[in-house]
A protein has these predicted regions:
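Intrinsic-disorder/low-complexity, polar/charged segments
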Residues: 7-9, 68, 82, 154
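NTP-binding/hydrolysis catalytic cores, primarily Walker-type P-loop NTPases
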Residues: 144-175
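Conserved catalytic-core segment of NTP-binding enzymes
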Residues: 38-141
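P-loop/Walker-type NTP enzyme "switch/lid" segment
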Residues: 1-51, 138-144, 148-150
Length: 175
C-alpha cells in the first residue's frame, strides 16, 4: 500500500464547490471500502486548510469510517422518528459511541404515534441536538443548483443555524 500526504490546497481545488462549500462525498454502495490511511490523509489535508470539516458518513461501519469517527470532535446521528429507524439507530449509536466522545441525536419528523424528539433521545440514551422538521423543498426537484437551506430560511436552515450557534458556544469560539 502506498502512503503519502494530500495537500490541503490541492484537495480543495479538486473538489466541486457549491456556494463556497466544498463537497467530498462518501460512496453509498456496499462494496467500496476506503483504506484508513487514505481517510487519515484526506482528513488531515482538510483540517490543515482550517475551519470546520463536516463528514456525512455511510450507514455501514468499516475501518475507513472508524478512522473518521476516531477524529471527530462531535457526531450527530440523524434519526427518522419511526420505531424501526430508532431500533436501527440504537445499534449504530452503540458502535459509534465507543469511538466518539460527543455523540448526539437529531430527530427528523414526521413522528410516528407515541414518539417525539425527546422520547427518541431517551430511547437511544443520547443528548438531543434538536429536531429536524420536514423540509418541503427537499420533496420536490430543485432547480438552479442551490443546496437545501441556502436561503437561510426554512426548517433545515433554522436547525443548522441553531445547532451551529450552540456548538460554537460549547467549543469556546469560532471554528
Amino acid at each position: 500500500a502506498s502512503r503519502g500526504r494530500v495537500g490541503g490546497g490541492a484537495l480543495e481545488e479538486s473538489l466541486p464547490a457549491l456556494h463556497s462549500l466544498r463537497v467530498l462525498s462518501w460512496d453509498r454502495g456496499d462494496c467500496v471500502a476506503v483504506p484508513p490511511q487514505a481517510v487519515r490523509a484526506v482528513l488531515a489535508a482538510a483540517r490543515r486548510r482550517g475551519g470546520t470539516v463536516v463528514v456525512d458518513l455511510p450507514r455501514r461501519l468499516d475501518e475507513g469510517v472508524g478512522e473518521v469517527l476516531a477524529q471527530l470532535d462531535l457526531a450527530l446521528l440523524v434519526v427518522p422518528a419511526e420505531l424501526r429507524a430508532v431500533a436501527a439507530a440504537g445499534r449504530i449509536a452503540a458502535a459509534v459511541g465507543m469511538a466518539v466522545r460527543d455523540l448526539r441525536v437529531a430527530v427528523r419528523g414526521p413522528y410516528a404515534p407515541g414518539l417525539d424528539d425527546r422520547e427518541v433521545a431517551r430511547l437511544l440514551g443520547l443528548p438531543l441536538a434538536g429536531e429536524v422538521p420536514v423540509e418541503p423543498g427537499l420533496l420536490r426537484p430543485r432547480g438552479g443548483g442551490r443546496p437545501p437551506g441556502a436561503s437561510g430560511r426554512g426548517p433545515l436552515a433554522r436547525f443548522c443555524t441553531g445547532f451551529w450557534e450552540r456548538a460554537l458556544v460549547e467549543s469556546g469560539g469560532a471554528r
